[in-house]
C-alpha cells in the first residue's frame, strides 16, 4: 500500500540536489519496501493521490546503523519485563551480567530477541558484522527474523576495553550523515526513523532514545506510545 510519512522536518542526509539539506514540512512516499518520492509534503502528496498518510512529530531521517550489535546482544543481558522488579529495565553487562551466573540458551535467546527490539526502538535499521554476516546462530536468527539489514564493519569505530557500547548509535559522536546507514533516495529501501525533536542539533544532543517510529523495508516495526 502506498504510504506517505510526513513530518515537520525531513532530513534526507543525501548528496543529491534537493536532498542535501532539511526539508521543512517534508514527506517520504513509500510503496512496498521502496521509497518513491522525497520532498515537501505538498509535492509528494500531489504525486501520490489516494495514499495513506502517517503524520509524525519532530524529524524524519534515514534509519540508523548500529556498529556494535554482537557486543550488545551477546555481552549484555536484556531483562524480560517480568524481571524488571529484580533486574531493572536496562541492559546488564560486566559484573551485573556475571552475577546472573550461567544462563541457559533459552534465556539468552530471549535476551537477544529483546535486544533486537530495543535497537528498533532506537531507530536502528542496519547492524554491522564482519563480512556482513553473524556466525552466532542465535544472533543470526534474531536479526534475520527482524528484517534488519546486515552491513560490513569497514570504517567501524573501535571499542575501548571495558567500555559498554550504547544502544544509541549517536553515542559514537558522529553527525547524522555519519550515523545513518544511507541517505533517503528514490528507489532505495524504505528504512526510516522518526524522532520527537525539533532539528538535527537537538537529535544529536538528546540521542536516539527520542525515537517515536521506525520503518523497516516499508513496515512500521516500532511506534512509540
Q: Model-derived features: where do they sit?
A:
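N-terminal metal-binding scaffold of metallo-dependent hydrolase/deaminase domains
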Residues: 1-47, 168-205, 215-225
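Active-site mouth loops of central-metabolism enzymes
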Residues: 95-111
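Long, charge-dense
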Residues: 80-94, 102, 151-167
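Phosphate/adenylate-binding glycine loop and adjacent helical scaffold
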Residues: 114
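Hydrophobic/aromatic ligand-binding patch that stacks against planar heteroaromatic rings
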Residues: 118, 142, 186
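Active-site loop-helix segments enriched in His/Asp/Glu that coordinate
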Residues: 121-161
Amino acid at each position: 500500500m502506498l504510504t506517505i510519512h510526513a513530518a515537520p522536518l525531513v532530513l534526507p542526509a543525501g548528496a543529491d540536489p534537493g536532498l542535501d539539506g532539511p526539508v521543512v514540512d517534508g514527506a517520504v512516499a513509500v510503496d512496498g519496501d521502496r521509497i518513491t518520492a522525497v520532498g515537501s509534503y505538498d509535492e509528494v502528496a500531489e504525486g501520490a493521490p489516494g495514499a495513506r498518510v502517517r503524520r509524525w512529530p519532530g524529524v524524519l531521517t534515514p534509519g540508523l546503523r548500529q556498529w556494535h550489535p554482537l557486543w550488545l546482544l551477546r555481552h549484555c543481558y536484556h531483562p524480560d519485563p517480568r524481571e524488571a522488579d529484580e533486574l531493572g529495565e536496562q541492559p546488564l553487562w560486566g559484573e551485573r551480567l556475571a552475577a546472573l551466573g550461567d544462563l541457559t540458551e533459552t534465556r539468552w535467546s530471549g535476551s537477544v530477541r529483546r535486544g533486537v527490539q530495543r535497537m528498533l526502538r532506537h531507530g536502528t535499521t542496519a547492524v554491522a558484522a564482519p563480512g556482513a554476516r553473524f556466525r552466532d546462530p542465535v544472533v543470526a536468527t534474531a536479526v534475520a527474523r527482524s528484517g534488519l539489514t546486515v552491513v560490513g564493519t569497514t570504517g567501524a569505530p573501535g571499542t575501548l576495553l571495558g567500555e559498554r557500547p550504547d544502544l544509541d548509535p549517536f553515542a559514537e559522536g558522529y553527525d547524522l550523515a555519519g550515523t545513518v546507514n544511507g541517505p533517503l533516495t528514490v528507489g532505495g529501501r524504505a528504512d526510516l526513523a522518526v524522532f520527537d525533536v525539533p532539528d538535527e542539533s537537538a537529535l544529536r544532543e538528546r540521542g536516539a532514545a527520542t525515537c517515536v517510529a521506525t520503518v523497516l523495508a516499508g513496515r512500521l516495526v516500532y511506534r512509540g506510545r
